[in-house]
């Protein structure tokens, strides 16, 4: 009798053990599936308008958006073009741009609240005119581009620092009235031309470095830069064309030095329009 009872209890215990083990396995499997299930954090499609092929952001329509990560969104990360006026007058404060981005249209962010812009593209980006004019950007690291468009950052009063990528031309008024900018370092950028009034009225800029590749400096390029006392021009194969002598007029009594390659000092001093600044021109200190 005892043997039968003991055998029955052992059988019951084994069944209970198998049941609990199976239940635990099923629970763990469900939990794992739930954990691994992808979470869709995409921005509601009603917040924006895309082109039919999904490659152009035509317009941002949500008026309350302040932060946007386009690269983190499965649809917006495919965008390669931001159309003209897309974020104009919006409350957007920060944006992380997609890796595929190739073009930003005219006035795309003009008069918006944007203060932080992050570029992720490895390819050159084409900028439209005045795309970031009158915004709150404080510092920016620019991607490689053929040209920094006319008036691109004009009136960005809070812009203190710019890190330039490769660029061939800086357009007219590109940084005009960026009154917080403290220095302009264009060394090793491959820059060929600076447009008219490109850095005019950058009132706090104390130093500017122009690369060996510079060939043309436009009229009033650095005019109204009251404290710009140190300008280095590294071009030595030929003296760059200075379109007007007023390129460096400060509007103040600041004592300014223009440093040029030691072997070309006299060439600079005697070149058209440069001769106006012959007393300020001196050799680069090695």
Model-identified regions with their sequence ranges:
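Bacterial Sec-dependent N-terminal signal peptides
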Residues: 1-52
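Structural signature of tandem-repeat unit edges
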Residues: 46-52, 63-81, 90-103, 112-126, ...
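A short, structured beta-strand/loop element
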Residues: 55-60
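Consensus positions within tandem repeat domains that build extended binding/scaffold surfaces
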Residues: 84-85, 105-108, 129-131, 149-152, ...
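A structural signal for leucine-rich repeat
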Residues: 245-251, 272
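Extracellular interaction modules
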Residues: 274-277
């Amino acid at each position: 009798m005892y043997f039968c009872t003991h055998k029955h209890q052992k059988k019951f215990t084994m069944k209970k053990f198998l049941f609990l083990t199976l239940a635990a396995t099923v629970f763990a499997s469900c939990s794992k599936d739930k954990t691994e299930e992808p979470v869709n954090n995409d921005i509601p499609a009603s917040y924006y308008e895309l082109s039919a092929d999904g490659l152009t952001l035509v317009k941002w329509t949500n008026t309350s958006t302040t932060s946007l990560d386009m690269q983190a969104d499965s649809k917006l990360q495919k965008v390669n073009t931001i159309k003209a006026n897309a974020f104009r007058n919006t409350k957007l404060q920060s944006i992380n741009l997609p890796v595929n981005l190739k073009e930003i249209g005219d006035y795309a962010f003009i008069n918006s609240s944007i203060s932080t812009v992050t570029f992720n593209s490895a390819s050159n980006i084409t900028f439209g005119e005045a795309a970031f004019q009158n915004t709150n950007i404080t510092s920016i690291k620019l991607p490689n581009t053929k040209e920094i468009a006319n008036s691109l950052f004009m009136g960005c009063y809070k812009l203190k620092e710019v890190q330039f990528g490769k660029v061939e031309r800086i357009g007219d008024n590109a940084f005009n009235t960026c009154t917080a900018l403290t220095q302009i370092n264009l060394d090793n950028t491959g820059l060929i031309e600076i447009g008219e009034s490109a850095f005019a009225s950058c009132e706090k800029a104390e130093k500017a470095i122009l690369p060996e590749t510079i060939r043309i400096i436009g009229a009033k390029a650095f005019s109204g830069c009251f404290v710009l006392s140190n300008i280095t021009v590294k071009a030595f194969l030929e003296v760059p064309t200075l379109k007007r002598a007023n390129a460096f007029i400060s509007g103040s009594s600041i004592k300014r030095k223009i440093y040029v390659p030691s072997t070309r000092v006299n060439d600079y001093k005697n070149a058209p329009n440069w001769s106006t600044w012959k007393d300020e021109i001196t050799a680069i200190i090695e």
